[in-house]
């Protein structure tokens, strides 16, 4: 009897023993120490929701690096973060406009699509309405943007020459060590969007960024995009820009609808 062999040690319920057996079957011995860096509840979640292999190891590493709670780990698996952060299929010009390894890190940081499940808005909603909800839920926004993002401001004012300009959202990323300009478009991608964002990126480089900051990166978030059109639009753009789609809470595809906790429930458990 296990309880007799290990008196005073708890956690040997039938359920836990089944997870222990599954862990022994599926986790190779050289990786066991990695799993010791997260609580047992996290391990059970990984065993439940992922198969052995690269995808599971990616979520394990992300949970350790970011200090995710069990609720956040569960949420990120449900939102398919691993799939959304894969480099293949992302529309950027980072490889051409940023030095290595910054280009690879920026590419890895980008997601497509972004899932803003904490925002509900009508189809006809204005961009500033969506921005307001983002800023009102800035903790959730930062969670979706990913590691290292710090919020600098909404409608961030830039004075260039004798004119005034306002950036939708400005962030600083401590991993990239650069400013990130986000422009939000509540419509399908258009080629002219890259010109405006390219100007904002250049202006932040010239007016805001410091001597030791890396080149500013631009992120254009659109309701939808034609990848071929977006790729051609970036081909001759010198500013580092990525183009991604985004989804709001009332626009999630069917596979997400029944698996997500409410934003309130998620944040109460973080």
Regions of interest found by a model, annotated:
Residues 1-270:
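Basic, low-complexity intrinsically disordered segments
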């Amino acid at each position: 009897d296990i309880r007799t062999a290990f008196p005073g040690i708890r956690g040997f319920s039938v359920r836990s023993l089944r997870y222990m057996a599954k862990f022994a079957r599926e986790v190779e011995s050289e990786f066991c120490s990695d799993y010791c860096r997260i609580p047992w509840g996290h391990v059970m979640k990984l065993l439940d929701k992922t198969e052995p292999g690269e995808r599971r190891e990616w979520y394990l590493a992300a949970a350790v690096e970011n200090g995710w709670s069990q609720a956040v780990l569960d949420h990120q698996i449900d939102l398919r973060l691993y799939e959304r952060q894969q480099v293949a299929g992302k529309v950027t010009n980072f490889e051409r406009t940023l030095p290595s390894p910054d280009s690879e890190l920026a590419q890895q940081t980008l997601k497509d699509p972004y899932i803003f499940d904490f925002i509900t808005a009508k189809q006809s909603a204005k961009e500033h309405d969506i921005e307001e909800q983002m800023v009102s839920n800035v903790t959730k926004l930062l969670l979706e943007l990913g590691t290292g993002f710090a919020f600098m401001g909404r409608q961030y004012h830039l004075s260039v020459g004798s004119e005034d300009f306002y950036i939708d959202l400005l962030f600083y990323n401590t991993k990239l060590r650069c400013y990130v300009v986000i422009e939000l478009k509540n419509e399908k991608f258009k080629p002219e969007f890259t010109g405006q964002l390219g100007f904002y990126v250049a202006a932040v480089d010239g007016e805001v960024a410091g001597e030791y900051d890396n080149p500013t990166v631009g992120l254009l978030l659109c309701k939808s995009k034609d990848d071929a059109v977006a790729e051609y639009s970036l081909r001759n753009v010198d500013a580092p820009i990525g183009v991604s789609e985004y989804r709001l809470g009332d626009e999630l595809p069917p596979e997400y609808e029944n698996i997500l906790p409410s934003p309130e429930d998620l944040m109460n458990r973080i």
